[in-house]
Amino acid sequence: MLARSGWLSLEALSEYGLSLAAVRAYVEIGFVEPLEVGGAWYFREEDLLRMAKAERIRKDLGANLIGAALVVEILERT
């Protein structure tokens, strides 16, 4: 039911090239906010895409996690 409403489970992480450790870190810094149901996290597809963009910035430019998240937020404002 959640998948039909636009929320994706942690199993979708691999489709977006995201590790569980990276997702936990993005949640910890407040870059994304999961929906928690029964102890499981669910994310909107747009949040998974935001994290994937930040991860590409980290890998391609050598930015740290907070810096990559900040770049994504700045790009979204333009």
Swiss-Prot record:
InterPro entries: DNA-bd_dom_put_sf. Disulfide bonds: none annotated. Keywords: Chaperone, Stress response. It comes from the Bacteria. The N-terminus is blocked. Pfam families: MerR_2 (PF13591). Required for correct assembly of the DnaK-DnaJ complex in the resting state. Seems to stabilize this ternary complex until it is replaced by substrate proteins under heat-shock conditions. Forms a heterononamer with DnaK and DnaJ. Three copies of each protein are present in the complex. This is Protein DafA.
